[in-house]
Amino acid sequence: MVPFADLWLRLKPGADVALLMGMMRVIVDEGLLDSEFIKERCENFDAFKESLKAFDIDSVERITGVAGEEVVSAARTYADNKPSTILYGAGFTQSSHGTDNVIAAANLAMLTGNIGKPSSGVNPLGGQNNVQ
């Protein structure tokens, strides 16, 4: 997939959640979220928004090894291009924090209203049926 990417984020192993939380922090701070979708379809948004405070760009850069400006660029690209989809492979889930990775990806999709619409959502890519 890398040859087709406009931006390739080379993060440290195990830093997926921090990267996604940092992207969501940017989206909230810059008002790129889908407020109507959140109001109609999401619960506990205020608590979620509060949890993002721990993921400022400097902290995310330190945790992930990804330059802050790349995190911001990824967040803006994802939020500004509708519909957006998240595709992931088995490596995303095959770790002690795999469930947290999927939850964070789903939260990113919901934050931007990129779920339940054609060409959107959170989509695992597997080599066999029902692998996920």
Regions found by a protein language model. Give the residues of each.
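Cofactor-pocket helix-loop regions in the catalytic cores of large enzyme subunits
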Residues: 1-130
